Amino acid sequence: VVTLYPSFPLHEDYTKLMGGSVERLAINDKLQIDLTKLIERAAQPAKLLIFANPMNPSGSWLNPEQLRQLFAAKHPETMLVLDEAYHEYAVHGNYTSGLDLTELIPGHWVVLRTFSKSWGLAGLRIGFGVCSSTELCQALDRPRTPFNTNQLAQIAAKAALDHEDYMLH
């Protein structure tokens, strides 16, 4: 699994927990993604390439053109996971969600979002993912334990989505 460093530690922790190995790509001295290094590595096959965009901990992100360059270079056998946990905080500048550019991503991909950050529902442990295909979604759902998201969390997430304008102000 290829990931950026430093970044959200659970990308590495879960990989190791499942017996996988982690390859770290260092971000630059300005705490931004080294696009050249990322594109060079993305062109080579890997089981998974996962990183936060916007970045954790720096808040920097790849702009739409940089995402296009990355997607064009990505090896088609590598699954790409974009962790957009901080998506709602990127309300200024030239941020674009990976969801707006998915037609450009070769092969399998997943975009992750959470209600933990801007929605303030961290204790409820709820989020969602959008997958490149129904088959991938079903494959990812197979090992999920039953009842892993409680009803209160589901009700709170729905209420948050019903009042998105409140969160944005």
Regions found by a protein language model. Give the residues of each.
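Active-site donor-binding loop signature of nucleotide-sugar glycosyltransferases
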Residues: 27-29, 53, 114, 142
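PLP-dependent aminotransferase-like
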Residues: 1-51
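Active-site pre-lysine segment of PLP-dependent enzymes
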Residues: 16, 33-45, 57-80, 84-118
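PLP-dependent aminotransferase class I/II
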Residues: 108-169
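Amphipathic alpha-helical repeat scaffolds
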Residues: 53-56, 150
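Glycine-rich, N-terminal phosphate-binding loop of Rossmann-like dinucleotide-binding domains
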Residues: 5, 52-53, 84, 89, ...
